[in-house]
């Protein structure tokens, strides 16, 4: 359950531009219970994102009900709540399968950009300029849920759709200029233009259950002669056993 933030937004506004990961962490944990370690990583990534540095993309791994989507929603709540963060409010949460055309086995980044564009227009209001729309989109935070469902291998066989998704998503996360058509006001009337959306300043938060990952790690570190120094006992207790 996500709880409303109770700290005054003005507290953050006063230090905007140099807001520390510690302050961000305290704000995020007001809406997420029992996930402090994940929130610390998220706080550092958001801090870099706000300062315009290369964002630290995040992969959230955990079974259903552990709070992955809650963390994504709470990141969006942080941007929506704090005055002064308007330029970073283009946050979109989508399912991984929406990024692939299964019929054509084709990666569809335009679907992601469309969701970001819709959010950016809400933020900027009626008839935004092309420059403002492009800049807001390039500062977006993209949350992709259930990335594990698009595995490259299913039942021991290659999954072309999963391969296409992973390659396409990794390309965007590493930084890519992608052509995208935008309708924007040029001072006289609305025009449609093709612009290049630069993903280098976007922050990506991906989440998935990754069922079977624990067994793979356990088998690796407990295998005789594996060369791994992690103790088997430590792996056993990691799952509460």
Where are these regions (language model features)?
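Pre-Walker A (pre-P-loop) alpha-helix and adjacent loop at the N terminus of AAA/AAA+ ATPase modules
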Residues: 17-57
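Residue-level signature of catalytic and energy-coupling elements of molecular machines
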Residues: 35, 42, 95, 169, ...
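Short glycine-rich substrate-engagement loop in P-loop NTPases that contacts/grips substrate
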Residues: 92-137, 180-185
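Walker A/P-loop
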Residues: 47-94
């Amino acid at each position: 359950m996500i709880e409303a933030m109770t700290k005054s937004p003005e507290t953050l506004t006063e230090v905007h531009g140099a807001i520390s990961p510690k302050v961000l962490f305290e704000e995020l944990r007001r809406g997420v219970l029992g996930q402090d370690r994940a929130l610390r990583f998220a706080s550092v990534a958001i801090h870099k994102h706000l300062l315009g540095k290369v964002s630290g993309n995040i992969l959230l791994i955990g079974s259903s009900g552990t709070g992955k989507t809650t963390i994504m929603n709470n990141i969006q709540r942080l941007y929506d709540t704090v005055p002064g963060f308007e330029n970073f409010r283009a946050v979109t949460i989508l399912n991984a399968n929406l990024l692939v055309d299964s019929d054509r086995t084709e990666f569809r980044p335009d679907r992601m950009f469309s969701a970001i564009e819709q959010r950016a227009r809400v933020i900027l209001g009626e008839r935004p300029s092309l420059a403002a729309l492009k800049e807001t989109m390039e500062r977006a935070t993209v949350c992709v849920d259930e990335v594990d469902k698009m595995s490259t291998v299913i039942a021991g066989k290659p999954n072309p759709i999963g391969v296409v998704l992973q390659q396409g998503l990794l390309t965007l996360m590493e930084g890519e200029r992608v052509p995208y058509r935008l309708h924007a006001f040029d001072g006289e009337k609305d025009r449609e233009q093709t612009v290049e959306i630069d993903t280098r300043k976007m922050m990506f938060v991906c989440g998935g259950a990754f069922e079977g990952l624990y067994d793979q790690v356990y088998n690796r570190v407990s295998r005789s002669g594996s060369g791994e120094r992690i103790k088997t006992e430590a792996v056993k207790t990691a799952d509460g056993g």
